[in-house]
A protein has these predicted regions:
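A helix-coil-helix interface module used to build multimeric assemblies
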Residues: 2-201, 207-222, 285-286, 296-300, ...
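Long, amphipathic alpha-helical stalk/connector segments used for oligomerization, subunit docking
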Residues: 307-393, 399
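A conserved active-site cap/scaffold subdomain adjacent to cofactor or substrate pockets
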Residues: 241-274, 283-344
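Amphipathic alpha-helices that form helix-helix packing interfaces
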Residues: 40-43, 126, 130-133, 137-140, ...
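Short beta-alpha connecting loops at secondary-structure transitions
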Residues: 21-25, 71-73, 283-303, 325-340, ...
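Active/binding-pocket-proximal capping segment
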Residues: 276, 399-406
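Active-site-adjacent "gating/activation" loops or surface patches in catalytic cores
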Residues: 211-242
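Glycine-rich cofactor-pocket loops
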Residues: 142-164, 276-292, 325-332, 357-377
Length: 481
């Protein structure tokens, strides 16, 4: 079958990066299996198993990367067991060591430990891209920290903020996601050697009941695979707890939540014509409507984020339905859910890198929309001006309310501009000229500490992240479609 007459995941053809696809590839998995078999043999030899020699370990090391896939595939057709098929294939390349490969271990030794190693690699890539997105948002927030815009609550005009301050809200949620990813990486533990039901009975037999040697084997394998020697789960059944998968996918789904919020805001702002995602010179927005500038990147972020957030249910149910020391109904579900969860998170961050690299702002539209609402926002200031000239605060409050209702009616029912300033200027109770009122309608005076908040957030929250991860700051992503 060719690639055109079989189903191929869109994550592979459209969305996920080559780096993340390799992390979850068969090649990475089976090379990791072989690295684990080398680590096991070396650790057992160090603890005194005389039937394992340095020559055998060296032979195993020689063939970690040149996997004879054809042999493994043919063997699996016969024995219907992927691990034993690869033990056999490895043994064909390493005849001296063939008899000691996988000694004392169960399938989960390579399967589960590899899953943990692969997920760590995936989390590290996600982390790097997340920091890259934060760097672009920081640059954007700094550039637009002083530009006033309308803030919305209930999607209704509320009070002014700044374009840059709004960007810090997007960034702050991603910082929360980064903290969660860091926590998962810091607490991730290898399964180690636990045997068929977690009791390490086979290793007690190998080492004649010497528990210290078994603990040393665990520590040695952990170190060789890049973990702290103490980073081995203390107890398990046959598998590591599937709660680990649920925790990790929840962390990835958190990224989906934050990115979906960003993308939704940008889609709404595009409708307001205040801001929009990058739009290529030759990009076509619609096959029927040539004028369309659809926010397809942000729409894709929302689509993939929705998928990722729903994917969390898979490891949640899997964890709850593992019977006793393990059941195999985790395997098929986990194989799909975890890999595609990582691919989805990767795809989302690729688009985020692309979008945040070129957000378009239309300052005149931003200001025009703000000025259309500012007379309402400034009503209290106008009232204070009038009180200073001898007006009655309570009477003025009621008159402002009536003027606001009338001006709002003109905007909504007549489709005419907001004339509240003219109404107040014409009302002798206020004693203010139009010029005096307009002079007070300076948007920058209504944004509070927004510019300073941006500066403080970048300096106190984002800059330490960038200083600690300089290699992650400058990243770019191109999209295939």
């Amino acid at each position: 079958m060719s690639q055109h007459d079989r189903y191929i995941s869109p994550f592979s053809t459209r969305y996920a990066s080559d780096e993340m696809q390799y992390i979850f590839s068969d090649d990475n998995k089976f090379r990791t299996w072989r690295r684990l078999w080398v680590a096991l043999a070396r650790a057992e030899m160090k603890q005194g198993l005389t039937n394992i020699t340095p020559e055998m370990v060296a032979e195993l090391e020689t063939h970690v990367d040149d996997i004879n896939y054809e042999v493994a595939i043919e063997r699996e057709k016969l024995v219907r067991h992927d691990v034993m098929s690869h033990v056999y294939a490895y043994g064909q390349q390493c005849p001296k060591a063939a008899g000691i490969i996988h000694l004392g271990a169960t399938s989960c030794y390579v399967g589960d430990n590899t899953d943990i190693i692969v997920m760590r690699q995936g989390l590290e890539l996600v982390r790097k891209k997340l920091i890259g997105v934060l760097a672009k948002l920081a640059k954007f927030a700094e550039e637009y920290k002083d530009m006033p815009c309308m803030a919305y609550t209930h999607c209704q005009p509320a009070q002014p903020t700044t374009v840059g301050k709004r960007a810090t809200l997007w960034a702050n949620e991603l910082v929360m996601d980064l903290n969660e990813i860091d926590h998962r990486l810091a607490t991730l533990q290898l399964r180690g050697v636990k045997g068929t039901t977690g009791t390490q009975a086979s290793f007690m037999e190998l080492f004649k009941g010497d528990a210290d040697k078994i603990r040393a084997v665990d520590a040695s394998i952990a170190e060789e695979m890049g973990f702290d020697c103490e980073a081995v789960i203390p107890v398990s059944g046959q598998t590591y707890s599937r709660k680990v998968d649920a925790f990790i996918l929840n962390a990835l789904a958190g990224i989906g939540q934050s990115c979906m919020k960003f993308a939704t805001d940008l889609r709404l702002l595009a409708n307001f014509k205040e801001m929009e995602e990058p739009f290529e010179k030759n990009q076509i927005g619609s096959s029927a409507m040539p004028y369309k500038r659809n926010p397809m990147r942000c729409e894709r972020i929302c689509a993939l984020s929705r998928y990722l957030m729903v994917d969390v249910l898979n490891p949640s149910f899997t964890t709850g339905t593992q019977w006793f020391e393990r059941t195999l109904d985790d395997s098929a579900n986990k194989r799909v859910a975890m890999a595609e969860g990582f691919l989805a998170a990767d795809a989302i961050l690729n688009i985020m890198l692309n979008v945040t690299d070129g957000i378009v702002v239309y300052p005149k539209v931003v200001r025009s929309r703000l000025m259309a609402e500012l007379p309402f926002m400034a009503s209290e200031n106008i009232m204070m001006q009038a009180v200073e000239k001898g007006g009655n605060r309570q009477e003025l409050h009621e008159r402002l309310r009536q003027h606001a209702i009338a001006a709002g009616k003109q905007v909504k029912e007549e489709g005419l501009p907001n004339d509240m300033v003219d109404r107040i200027a014409a009302d002798p109770a206020f004693g203010l000229t139009r010029e005096e009122i307009v002079a007070g309608l300076v948007p920058e005076n209504f944004v509070g500490r927004a510019p300073q908040q941006v500066e403080e957030f970048i300096a106190n929250v984002l800059k330490p992240i960038f200083d600690a991860n300089p290699d992650a700051v400058e990243q770019h992503a191109s999209l295939s479609v």
